[in-house]
């Protein structure tokens, strides 16, 4: 049996020397899709329909169909519209978008241009996590190259089509990964989630219709437009088309980003990451980042890495951030660290989250220190139940 291998769609080849440059990207067909759209003035609905057929779903966590999300932009909306890339990757275990921006920034730019064209937006913003200084530098350099090559700006390729793109660095707040908190921060305000409705497609950045997508999602668009919807959907499995970048960390021998077909068995992904370190037994896995439920070893070893497969074992794909834990792991300590993260990162806008996350962390810390009581277990459930479903954003549910 052959060993599992990567299929790189959003990440460049391993042997690439300077993959972040325009010259390298053009050699691999980069901007061909954008130039074809500009030359032919492809109908916007055609691009959206192609993305719908491809089966591309949001790679940031929610898994919402990308083509459908783009179609929510009101066609009759007059005036300015925006496309926004959410590169505020801040959840524990996530680091895929960092490598896309570091090594393949032009594909994100082309993806934003195509998505912007599809919804009628002439301006885009990439909101990049503040701690990602090198990725931000790479993206800024790529923007300069694209402008100099006439791929961004006014009257592109002699047409009346315009598209300009800007980057904005975040300031370290995890909550700004929530799309409406991101918009608040982008506008220079305190990063706190907005009430919905109205949704961003109606009232978004600066009060204008806005569509927000994840970095990996937008980077997937150019290859789909270039190679066709059927090509992309044939890579993955039913209901989970294409490739997915899994950020594997924890107790493995080769942690890192692995871009593989959706639906790959977890045991194959674990093999690619070198297996559990020191030959120890697997205890549990967090398959999609700290906001998704933990899966025990026996269940995850029989699971496929896609939306449906992980749902069947009571968890979720999330952002594809796979945290592997071996038999030496104390699960109470894991819970303590995760609960502290959400306590520290609560924006404080909603009382159940602001107060409840603190209560959860303090009780778990007490249990971790050997000072807990049986009553604490009941209190934990009681507090958690009073947070869930009572907050503006999903942080409380996490």
Predicted feature descriptions by range:
Residues 1-50:
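Cofactor-/ligand-binding subdomain signature composed of acidic, glycine-rich
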Residues 25-32, 85-97, 200-206, 247-252:
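Gly-rich Lys/Arg/Thr-decorated short loops/hinges at beta-loop-alpha junctions or inter-strand turns
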Residues 104-118:
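Histidine-anchored nucleotide/phosphate-binding helix
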Residues 51-73, 172-184, 188-190, 343-355, ...:
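Conserved phosphate/anionic-ligand binding catalytic regions in large, soluble enzymes, centered on
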Residues 33-50, 79-81, 87, 96-101, ...:
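Ferredoxin-type iron-sulfur electron-transfer modules in oxidoreductases and energy-metabolism complexes
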Residues 136-262, 274:
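Hydrophobic alpha-helical positions that pack around
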Residues 1-18, 205-211, 215-217, 225, ...:
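Intrinsic disorder at enzyme termini
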Residues 111-115, 261-279:
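Short amphipathic, charge-patterned alpha-helical segments
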């Amino acid at each position: 049996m052959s060993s599992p291998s990567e299929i790189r769609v959003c990440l460049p080849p391993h042997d690439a020397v300077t993959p972040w440059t325009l010259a390298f990207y053009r050699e691999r067909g980069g901007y061909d899709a954008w130039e074809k759209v500009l030359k032919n003035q492809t109908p916007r609905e055609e691009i959206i329909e192609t993305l719908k057929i491809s089966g591309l779903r949001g790679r940031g966590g929610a898994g919402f169909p990308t083509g459908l999300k783009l179609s929510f932009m009101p066609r009759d909306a007059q005036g300015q519209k925006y496309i926004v890339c959410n590169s505020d990757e801040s959840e524990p275990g996530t680091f895929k978008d960092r490598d896309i921006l570091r090594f393949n920034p032009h594909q994100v730019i082309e993806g934003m241009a195509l998505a912007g064209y599809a919804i009628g937006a002439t301006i885009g913003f990439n909101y990049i996590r503040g701690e990602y200084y090198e990725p931000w530098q790479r993206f800024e350099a790529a923007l300069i190259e694209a402008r100099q090559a006439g791929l961004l700006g006014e009257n592109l390729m002699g047409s009346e089509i315009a598209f300009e793109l800007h980057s904005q660095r975040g300031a370290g707040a995890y909550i700004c990964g929530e799309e409406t908190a991101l918009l608040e921060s982008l506008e220079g305000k305190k990063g706190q989630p907005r009430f919905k409705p109205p949704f961003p497609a109606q009232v978004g950045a600066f009060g204008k219709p806005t569509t927000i997508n994840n970095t990996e999602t937008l980077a997937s668009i150019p290859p789909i437009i270039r190679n066709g919807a059927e090509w992309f959907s044939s890579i993955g499995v039913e209901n989970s088309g294409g490739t997915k970048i899994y950020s594997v960390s924890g107790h493995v021998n080769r942690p890192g980003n692995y871009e593989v077909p959706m639906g790959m068995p977890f045991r194959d992904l674990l093999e690619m990451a070198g297996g559990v370190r020191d030959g120890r037994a697997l205890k549990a896995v967090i398959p999609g980042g700290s906001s998704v439920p933990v899966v025990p070893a026996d269940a995850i070893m029989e699971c496929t890495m896609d939306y449906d497969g992980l749902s069947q074992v009571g968890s979720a794909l999330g952002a594809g951030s796979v945290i592997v834990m071996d038999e030496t792991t104390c699960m109470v300590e894991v819970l303590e660290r995760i609960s502290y993260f959400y306590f520290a990162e609560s924006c404080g806008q909603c009382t159940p989250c602001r107060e409840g996350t603190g209560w959860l962390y303090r009780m778990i810390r007490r249990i971790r220190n050997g000072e807990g009581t049986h009553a604490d277990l009941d209190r934990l459930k009681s507090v958690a139940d009073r947070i869930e479903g009572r907050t503006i954003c999903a942080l409380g549910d996490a």
